[in-house]
A protein has these predicted regions:
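Transmembrane alpha-helical segments and their short flanking loops
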Residues: 2-17, 56-61, 263-269, 324-429
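Helix-loop-helix junctions within the multi-pass membrane cores of secondary transporters/permeases
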Residues: 6, 10-15, 255-339
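Cytosolic juxtamembrane amphipathic/interface segments immediately preceding
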Residues: 7-29, 66-67, 163-175, 322-324
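Early transmembrane hairpin of solute transport permeases
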Residues: 15-159, 330, 344
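Signature for phosphate-centric chemistry
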Residues: 490, 501, 526, 540, ...
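Catalytic core of bacterial c-di-GMP phosphodiesterases, primarily the EAL and HD-GYP domains
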Residues: 510-585
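The catalytic core of metal-dependent phosphodiesterases that act on cyclic dinucleotides
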Residues: 559-633, 647-649
Length: 649
């Protein structure tokens, strides 16, 4: 596979970030929370659907119990997102750095967070698990996990010779975890005590909100203030901070208050207001993610199709957490650029349009869940507002498009690098005569294998595996036959190393379908060749798991009944290693298929008593010698003698 280092904007930063355990853990932890984001998003949609008749009905049906039940689901899903993030990020970090004790990481992080966020003697309020506390939760979780791992590693090294053989493993792990857990918990307890003595608030996001309110009180709500407001609210998502919540006080007490004061005074509404941002700068939610979804749809990339399907309906109502954490935007140095840029450009275009009189100002407050086009008309009282939204939508989609290309190119490059490492590991195992275990190793390796396995399964189902034929030439330079080969060209990783594809299929229970697909394609093409009057020999490699399958012979016989080969021959090549490793059912099933016209060859035949005995007890039409035997046949008399002996057998 050709490896080319593409010049991609943000590539170095992205590569560095993807090499850090804590950043990988944050991303994967947030991904694990997506089902709860989806459930919570639909609950918000059900309770905030911007139709007055519906709102009256949902609050009155069953005496309001349906509405209450929806709120219960919301509070248990989206309303508890910080709790989920603490557990999933700590679990992901533990899985990234070691394969055991993930529970200790999770519980230690949760207890540390609960200690840090307590206030006074009242204990813990459930509100500390809402989205506004998510950044604080992630920060405490990462620090707790890193400290826990550091202390545990040092402590484990210190006591490694103090345990005797036979000690229960779970008990030993628990004892080893006591000191690290204690250190982490008391570290946060001491820090919380110091902050309490200093009178410092523990919610980092709230601290930032207070400082920003004072800042905007000085800057004002003009063009500079509006640009800074949007920049800060969008860039904060890169760090996992809910930008809209962090600047909620600024948007309501400054920008929205300016609109209500103008309406009350009977003067012209200001250009910039909370309604202006919701209608013209945040189409589909933060970052104008409806534009992002449109760009994804237009590119028709299979990889992003699931994200589009899951995110499009909520985004129509400006609910976009699914997209923010699914793409993701969080900790993504490539996608954060258009995420910030699109709202700023849309704000500039909308402000100029209002300033020169093309569109009336957004002087009527509308619900933030009101869909595009409707919100433009209702807020301005003019169809011009809807037309402006459509123009801004096109502009935003256009800006997102090239950044999606960059992001995909970077993802493809990372996958290529990981696949190349996997290939190198497999080749090293082959040289040692070992079989690679694809399900063990680093987290990156296991995730790469999961990705390739999923893609291979889809490729088999969709018939995307290519069939190639390698000619077999006689000593007289004539074509004796062909060997059927399946080759997988991955859409991102490129040409896949064939033995690695076989191992992926074998270790993930895909080999039966993979092998039968090759046999059927070979049979179909052999029938075409026979009709052209070419009596060729078609060879197909067979692996152990296929012969061990109880349905293998039935499926092969069904294929043989479907196609007719005339003077051509279908041959199954069985490797010597496979023949010696399989159970006693193999000869019986070989005989069954021989009666149906299948010819058997032994492939990669070597030496040894077991090999010779197997050759003696089974009827093979031909033997393909292993390369180690024929490599020196011209200049080594012993090799010549051995091969002559095999020929006589």
């Amino acid at each position: 596979m050709e490896q080319k280092q593409k010049k991609i904007f943000g590539n170095n930063l992205s590569t560095w970030m993807e090499s850090k355990d804590f950043i990988i853990a944050m991303r994967r932890g947030l991904l694990l929370c997506i089902p709860f984001f989806i459930i919570g998003s639909f609950c918000v949609l059900l309770t905030s659907f911007p139709v007055a008749v519906y709102q009256e009905w949902i609050r009155e049906v069953c005496n309001g119990m349906v509405y209450q039940a929806i709120l219960w689901v919301y509070h248990a899903s989206m309303g508890s997102v910080t709790l989920f993030v603490i557990l999933t990020v700590s679990h992901s970090y533990a899985s990234q750095v070691e394969e055991e004790d993930t529970g200790f990481y999770m519980l230690t992080s949760l207890v540390s967070y609960m200690i840090f966020v307590q206030s006074g003697i009242e204990g813990i309020s459930y509100t500390v698990f809402e989205a506004t506390w998510m950044f604080t939760g992630i920060l405490i979780t990462i620090i707790s996990c890193v400290v826990f791992r550091t202390v545990k590693s040092a402590y484990k090294h210190h006591i490694k010779n103090k345990y005797q053989a036979g000690v229960d493993v779970d008990f030993q792990n628990t004892v080893e975890a006591i000191l690290p857990i204690t250190c982490v918990i008391f570290m946060w307890a001491v820090l919380r005590l110091l902050l309490a003595l200093l009178g410092v608030e523990t919610d980092i996001q709230n601290i930032g909100s207070g400082l920003l309110t004072k800042l905007f009180g000085v800057i004002g709500t003009g063009a500079v203030g509006a640009a800074l407001f949007l920049f800060l609210s969008q860039i904060s998502w890169f760090f996992g901070i809910h930008g809209s919540d962090m600047l909620h006080v600024v948007s309501t007490e400054l920008f929205e208050k300016g609109l209500t004061d103008s309406i009350a005074a009977g003067v012209s509404a200001p250009i910039f207001s909370k309604t202006f941002f919701d209608v013209f700068a945040l189409i589909g939610g933060s970052g104008s993610t409806l534009c992002l979804l449109a760009a994804i749809c237009l590119r028709n990339n299979k990889k992003d199709r699931t994200l589009f399907k899951a995110g499009i309906v909520p985004a129509l109502f400006n609910i976009n957490e699914i997209v923010l954490f699914g793409l993701p935007v969080v900790l993504n140095p490539i996608m954060i650029i258009p995420f910030v840029l699109v709202p700023l450009v849309q704000t500039a275009v909308a402000a100029i349009s209002i300033f020169i009189g093309l569109v009336p100002p957004a002087s009527v407050q509308v619900g933030w869940t009101t869909p595009i086009l409707f919100s433009g008309y209702l807020s301005t009282g003019s169809i011009a507002g809807s037309i402006l939204q459509a123009v801004l939508f096109i502009i935003g989609t256009t800006i997102y498009f090239p950044f999606l290309e960059m992001s995909d190119a970077h993802s493809a490059q990372m996958l290529q690098n990981n696949v190349e490492k996997l290939k190198e590991e497999m080749i090293a195992c082959e040289k040692k005569g070992e079989i690679i275990n694809l399900k063990k190793g680093s987290k990156v390796k296991r995730e790469t294998v999961k990705t390739l396995t999923r893609d291979l399964k889809e490729a088999i189902t969709a018939g995307e595996i290519k069939t190639f034929y390698q000619p077999q030439i006689t000593s007289k330079n004539t074509v004796y036959g062909v060997e059927a080969l399946l080759r997988w060209i991955h859409p991102e990783a490129g040409f896949m190393y064939p033995p690695m594809v076989i191992e992926l299929a074998r270790q993930n229970h895909l080999l039966d379908d993979f092998g039968i697909m090759l046999i059927e394609r070979a049979a179909q093409d052999l029938e075409h060749l026979s009709k052209r009057g070419k009596p060729l020999h078609m060879a197909v490699n067979i692996l152990p798991v296929q012969f061990e399958s109880d349905t293998f012979c039935d499926r092969v016989e069904a294929i043989l009944a479907k196609y007719h080969f005339g003077g051509c021959t279908m041959c199954f090549e069985i490797t010597e290693q496979m023949a010696l490793a399989t159970s006693g059912v193999v000869p019986e099933r070989m005989l069954r298929l021989k009666k149906n016209g299948i010819v058997f060859h032994m492939d990669d035949f070597g030496m040894g008593h077991s090999s010779m005995q197997y050759l003696q007890d089974n009827e093979f039409e031909a033997v393909k010698l292993d390369g180690s035997l024929v490599k020196h046949v011209l200049d080594n008399e012993r090799c010549q003698t051995i091969i002559a002996g095999i020929y006589q057998m």
